[in-house]
Amino acid sequence: MVAVLQSTFAIIFSMEFIVGTLGNGFIILMTCIDWVRRRKISLVDQILTALAITRITLILLVFIDWWVSVLFPALHETGKILRMYFISWTVINHCNLWLTASLSIIYFLKIASFSSIIFLYLKFRVKNVVFVTLLVSLFFLFINTAIVNVYFDVCFDGVQRNVSQVSRLYNHEQICKFLSFTNPMFAFIPFVTSMATFFLLIFSLWRHLKNMKHNAEGCRDVSTIVHIRALQTIIVSVVLYSTFFLSFFVKVWSSGSPERYLIFLFVWALGNAVLPAHTFVLIWGNCRLRWASLSLMLWLRYRFKNIDV
């Protein structure tokens, strides 16, 4: 039964890896082409490119970790491999979450409409806001990485004092429990940021529709469409964070229980599926990427028709 589950989820993870790599690779390719053509790159494209690179790296890391755990379980449980994997995962996932939050901030400041002095001040300084946000994230990244590194150092010291506890100290389950406490704690700030921008955009859209109704105008103007597309992007970001938190809680709940192993694999697959899903939402929410993807699909459809003929 376990072998069947591993084979099934191996196929699922492989499909997620392929789809996620293609989607994020498309974003990187189109952004680079546009950068070379225009000789400049916008702030949104910079964040999208950095996010796409981070996503590819994260998906690749999880994909490799899965296959190493299946094919080489003894190697997967060694201290050096665990330290390398979890520190790498902590850094890459941290960048993924904060870049996603930064993208939500950009959409909010560029699209929302408020008369507050503070909002207007931030609206005309979007680059500075994003720069400060990412700078603050580096501080939290340093603390998070240091905590994980210290935890492994304590494990190494324990092994040197008591060799008989090697398997327990380097147990993948124990480290997952530890990270299930630290990583959600450091992901809380970008999660709250995305939630705040989501609700503020809803409020901005509600005010906009109310004003249009009062002025007896149509409800599908350009501003409304832009609001809705931004909300679609941010709501998937919120789902991404929610799945992130859920996966860690399920890891703690299902650890040490073979009966809950299926639930653990399902939530893990769901968490990994959110990444490529969010990528395609980003493509659909960006006008340039959306038209490029539609053009690519039409070209592929035309090529396949010619092959059939």
UniProtKB/Swiss-Prot annotation:
Main location: membrane
Sample GO molecular function, one term: bitter taste receptor activity
Cellular localisation: Membrane
InterPro entries, per database record: TAS2R
Keyword Transmembrane carried by entry: yes
The protein's name: Taste receptor type 2 member 113
Disulphide bridges: none
Intervals, Extracellular compartment: 1-8, 77-101, 149-185, 251-262
Glycosylation (residues): N162
Stretches of the chain forming a coiled coil according to its record: none
Positions on the Cytoplasmic side per record topology: 30-55, 123-127, 207-229, 284-309
PANTHER family: TASTE RECEPTOR TYPE 2, TASTE RECEPTOR TYPE 2 MEMBER 113
Xref: Gene3D superfamilies: Rhodopsin 7-helix transmembrane proteins
Transmembrane segments: 9-29, 56-76, 102-122, 128-148, 186-206, 230-250, 263-283
Record SUPFAM superfamilies: Family A G protein-coupled receptor-like
Single Gene Ontology BP annotation: detection of chemical stimulus involved in sensory perception of bitter taste
More details: Several bitter taste receptors are expressed in a single taste receptor cell.
Function of the molecule: Putative taste receptor which may play a role in the perception of bitterness.
Entry's Gene Ontology cellular component terms: membrane
Superkingdom of the source species: Eukaryota
Family named by the database record: Belongs to the G-protein coupled receptor T2R family.
Pfam families: TAS2R
Membrane topology: Multi-pass membrane protein
Keywords of this entry: G-protein coupled receptor, Glycoprotein, Membrane, Receptor, Sensory transduction, Taste, Transducer, Transmembrane, Transmembrane helix
